[in-house]
Amino acid sequence: RSCNIPDGKCRKLIKDSFENYWKNIYQNKNTNNYEFQSLQSKETIDWHKKYIQNCISNQFKKYKPRVLDIGCCSGNLTNLFCQFSSEVVGVDYEEGFIKNANSKYSVPKFFIGDIYNLDKIDGSFDLVVCFGVLQNINDLVLALKNIKLKLSTRNHSKVVFTTINQNSIFNRNDLSLKLTRSREAKNLTLHTFTKDQFYQSSKLSGLKLTRYEYLYILPRFLGPLRFFIKKIMPTSFSHHIFVEMQHA
């Protein structure tokens, strides 16, 4: 429990806090500076782009998957799935993001919704992605149960998350927070989960944890040293984690 009030009120309090936070970001951003909310944002977005284009596209060679992107924001990453998918749906609870996405992209379908409420989204999906969202929720089991209901039972179907590493040193002091968070986010307490919490929550949700990996997303000038940094630096130097689940 993250607060000492009833579950319903606690969840609403947290949801309202993050809703106000995202609205503040949306109302004060413009298209040109969105990717540069922190020094690491550009590299983080670039990593996700490469993962979608180079990795996910190769995992679905036998059929074109139906894709659900939860927390799609303005659809910049969502649109990339259209290159190899039969249908792509993006969901975000911030209306401004959905309006922006619909104005920019014609092929993906975009809807207002959130990770706790996917009932209005029709059908099941071979791939569910949730990039940078879990640090904004407190009920991991409930989120996973909702996702499971949307995950198809076809071969290779999976759900993929990226989120913040709980053990990251970049969560521990003011200088590190300036490097890894936007100005609006640096004073917020984000929710992080251990590997064991992911494992236990997946079991309770009817899913199984199939991959858990520390990501070393580095500033571009350190890119050539990535291999050595992964070998010699502890996992606390990884600010992000990659999590994959499938039906149990």
Regions found by a protein language model. Name each.
Residues S74-N117:
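Class I SAM-dependent methyltransferase SAM/SAH-binding core
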Residues V129:
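A conserved beta-strand element that flanks and buttresses the S-adenosyl-L-methionine
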Residues G132-N136:
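Short catalytic micro-motifs in class I SAM-dependent methyltransferases
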Residues V141-H156:
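A short glycine-rich, Lys/Arg-flanked "PGG" loop and its adjoining helix->strand segment in the class I
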Residues T180-Q197:
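Acceptor-substrate binding/catalytic loop of class I
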Residues R1-K61, K64-G71, V160-S182:
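Conserved class I S-adenosyl-L-methionine
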